[in-house]
A protein has these predicted regions:
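Alpha-helical segment proximal to the catalytic Tyr-Lys
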Residues: 151, 196-197, 271
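Residue(s) in the substrate-gating loop at a strand-loop-helix junction
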Residues: 167
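Short C-terminal tail/terminal secondary-structure segment
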Residues: 270, 274-290
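Active-site loop immediately N-terminal to the catalytic Tyr-X3-Lys motif
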Residues: 124, 172-178, 200, 250
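Substrate-binding pocket helix/loop in short-chain dehydrogenase/reductase
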Residues: 122-123, 127-135, 243
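Short, small/polar-rich loop/turn modules that mediate ligand/substrate recognition or access, typified
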Residues: 199, 204, 273-275
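Active-site helix of classical SDR
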Residues: 146, 183
Length: 290
């Protein structure tokens, strides 16, 4: 006769083992905690949504608290996404936001510096206030976010990723754009400097250089969009097509394409890459490395 134990093994345990073997693999970013600035619209929103879809818990950070909350709720419950208002020009607000991220999810190990703005003016029309604001938001703001999140990552001793959303303008000179281009160039060099410093802690620092991301953009929704349309002599709602037309691939760059590049860097396939950047511009020859 068959023992009760053998009956159990035949009828139950083998079946359960088969079920376990058929379970889907964990998502690529499971157990990662991402802090995304400028996440209420455009590129930042697309990145936050993509990282969450790949398994990460996400802090949706933006100075527009209501919009950030809408994005977080759209992603999912507070077990997955939490909105944290933050103006990156404020050192104190950044410190508080990182602390809230740690409180919400137990740590931070994936940081996206996306917050930005632009005021396009000629050199003679660019005021000190114009210059200071763009550097405070992008150069200084990303420095502060990187510094405060690095404190956490070093203490965690688990490594991590910092990604800067810079711009094609970081490497291509264009007229009537001095403050924005200089701030983006600052961000691009922060990538290299921080990569050199943080490698010993297992923290990788990389950048993305997009170009012409009009759809859903908070930057293009303001005076920047009007100015660029006037500068290029096109209708505002045709800006995306215009930018696509001057690229090698003749394809418009959307926020989701930038999010794809971020995931490529942090999804586990490029673990030996740091201090570099990925252009997401459909091919802009003047931006080629040289």
């Amino acid at each position: 006769p068959i023992s009760d134990a053998e009956k159990f093994r035949i009828e139950y345990w083998i079946l359960e083992e088969a079920k376990l073997a058929r379970r889907p693999k964990p998502k690529a970013l499971a157990a990662r905690v991402a802090f995304v600035t400028g996440a209420a619209s455009g590129i930042g929103r697309a990145i936050a949504e993509r990282l969450a879809a790949e398994g990460a818990c996400v802090i949706v950070s933006d100075r527009d608290a209501e919009a950030a909350q809408d994005v977080a709720q759209g992603i999912g419950s507070t077990d997955v996404a939490v909105a944290v208002p933050c103006d990156v020009t404020s050192e104190g607000q950044i410190q508080d936001a990182i602390a809230q991220a740690v409180l919400a999810f137990g740590g931070v190990d994936l940081v996206i510096n996306d917050a930005g703005l632009s005021v396009a003016k000629s050199l003679l029309d660019t005021s000190v206030d114009d210059w200071d604001l763009q550097h405070q938001v992008m150069a200084r703001g990303s420095f502060l976010v990187s510094r405060e999140s690095t404190r956490v990552m070093i203490e965690q001793a688990l490594g991590g990723d910092i990604i800067y959303i810079a711009s094609k303008n970081a490497v291509v000179a264009s007229a009537k754009n001095v403050a924005y281009a200089a701030a983006k160039a600052d961000q691009a060099h922060q990538v290299r400097v921080l990569a050199a410093e943080l490698g010993e802690f297992g923290i990788r620092v990389n950048g993305i250089h997009p170009d012409g991301v009009v759809q859903g953009s908070g930057i293009f929704a303001n005076e920047w969009g009007d100015d660029r349309a006037a500068h290029y002599g096109v209708e505002r709602d045709k800006l995306g097509e215009y930018y696509a037309g001057r690229t090698l691939l003749k394809l418009e760059v959307l926020p989701a394409h930038v999010a794809d590049a971020v995931f490529a860097l942090v999804g586990g396939e490029l673990t030996r890459t740091t201090g570099s950047y990925i252009p997401v511009d459909s091919g802009v020859a003047p931006a080629f490395p040289r």
